[in-house]
Amino acid sequence: MKLLEDRIHTDGQVLGQDILKVDRFLTHQVDYQLMKEIGKRFAQVYANAGVTKVVTIEASGIAPALYAAESLNVPMIFAKKAKNVTMNDDLLITEVYSFTKKLTSTVQISSKLIEEGDKVLIIDDFLANGQAALGLVHLMEQAKAEVVGLGMVIEKSFQDGRQKLLDQGMKLTSLARIEKFEDGKVIFAPADDKDFD
């Protein structure tokens, strides 16, 4: 998605060899107009997939997932990283490792929110090692829901997450694919949605 790549060039900051800071529009401050366009793009890509729910994980996946759900006219559900007192139903639970935070979290969704046979589009902010996405896939398997696709806002193609998801037979759409960081700059690989630009 050229609009997203341009924004990464303008406001993204490369930290070291494997971190991209995008807190000016995605991971801290949210540019709702850009998120709306991202949501529309995911809805275009998955328009014929019969999506009944959009699922993400808190926190930075919420904005793009919400706009994708709005464009698809379906509910959006986010997996919580901490159980609160109101979550007293049966829970779908798994553990996910965060590459950026370097920690493992237990994530959960109420089993009442995902029904057997739901067709789920999983959206997340970043794809690095694939652990968050695979964790959400595992939650959907527990619910006997079908994952019809995974939409990643930004993918670090130099890490193994993409291959892990493709090896599981998943349909994957990444709107910005980073081939590498070079001299503090982002070098992009062709995005999965290039036919829509």
UniProtKB/Swiss-Prot annotation:
Keywords attached to this Swiss-Prot or TrEMBL record, sorted alphabetically, are: Cytoplasm, Glycosyltransferase, Purine salvage, Transferase
Q: Which domain of life is it from?
A: Bacteria
Q: One GO BP annotation here?
A: XMP salvage
Keyword Chaperone set for record? no
**GO CC terms for this protein?**
cytoplasm
Citing just one GO molecular function, the answer is: xanthine phosphoribosyltransferase activity
| Catalysed reactions, as listed in the record | XMP + diphosphate = xanthine + 5-phospho-alpha-D-ribose 1-diphosphate
Compartments where located: Cytoplasm
- Annotated pathway, please? Purine metabolism; XMP biosynthesis via salvage pathway; XMP from xanthine: step 1/1
This entry's Enzyme Commission designation comes to 2.4.2.22
Does the UniProt entry include the keyword Transferase?
yes
Q: Which residues bind 5-phospho-alpha-D-ribose 1-diphosphate?
A: A128, N129, G130, Q131, A132
Binding, xanthine: L20, T27, K156
- Top enzyme class: transferase
Q: How does it assemble?
A: Homodimer.
User: Its function?
Assistant: Converts the preformed base xanthine, a product of nucleic acid breakdown, to xanthosine 5'-monophosphate (XMP), so it can be reused for RNA or DNA synthesis.
What is the similarity comment for this entry?
Belongs to the purine/pyrimidine phosphoribosyltransferase family. Xpt subfamily.
Official protein name in the record: Xanthine phosphoribosyltransferase
Species in which this protein is naturally found = Lactococcus lactis subsp. lactis (strain IL1403)
- Identify the taxonomic lineage of the organism of origin: Bacteria, Bacillati, Bacillota, Bacilli, Lactobacillales
